[in-house]
């Protein structure tokens, strides 16, 4: 094992990486709440990789996210989902306090791409197509990603796209009480479907489809469509564009409190997407309209979206693989998460790495 200190662009502190001597650590490429990502070279093969160092053991929530991430990224084997090439095995359980995931190195992410350049219509088509292609695999496995946003779509120079960060993912099949969902739901609200904010007893695959709609809108215009400052502002921005829900959609909202809240708001007329996106093609706007349907029941599915004429240049039903449904016990730890101590979660992570 070698301890390497990659150069830190902020210069504020040293970051130590306890990884195998097979890896030559290069630069810090990203930093999050409980992890750092460095680029590295795998010396035996010369392959460039990303090494994600995670220190999750201070918080149960970070442990849960790490466990979900490891289990799901190992489960999926898909061109548009980031893969784990290896996980650094710790020396022993006693000294185990960091997790190192070795992954494919991607050059940038959608958030940076949108901020630094105008994306062509062809780029938008290809990126949304790849996102939906990944989502088809997830949804066929009965997995909801729940945190799709531009920074979780990794890109390289060939315009290959890979979805990452499965820390909030959940089984779509488990409809046990989801009230714990919001406590852990620290995801960016800008890409959150309206039904998540209006009631959190049930959520479906349609929440991911809404996020794809928000991402497409942002790629087309270069700025977020619904940049809410808080819960109320978020809903207001959505209704400012989509208009007050129809009676049918209004009664589709399960929660009485949520219905009363909507009723208390002033009536809004729908703003035509053509007004918001004057330079965008009719086909792109038609898909956007279907992705951003207020009522999740009326929202387009991933399979339907892949067949939409806007994506026709890329759609190939023979090359859009599904994944087998995840077994019932796959998310067992999530069912018992409120009763698991940090030590028990650490043991589960250790077992997952060592398997």
From Swiss-Prot:
GO terms for cellular component: nucleus. The keyword Signal does not apply. Disulfide bonds: none annotated. Dually phosphorylated on Thr-183 and Tyr-185, which activates the enzyme. Keywords: ATP-binding, Kinase, Nucleotide-binding, Nucleus, Phosphoprotein, Serine/threonine-protein kinase, Transferase. The modification Phosphotyrosine is found at residue 185. It catalyses: L-seryl-[protein] + ATP = O-phospho-L-seryl-[protein] + ADP + H(+); L-threonyl-[protein] + ATP = O-phospho-L-threonyl-[protein] + ADP + H(+). It is found in: Nucleus. Its EC number is 2.7.11.24. The TXY motif contains the threonine and tyrosine residues whose phosphorylation activates the MAP kinases. Responds to activation by environmental stress by phosphorylating downstream targets. Belongs to the protein kinase superfamily. CMGC Ser/Thr protein kinase family. MAP kinase subfamily. This is Mitogen-activated protein kinase.
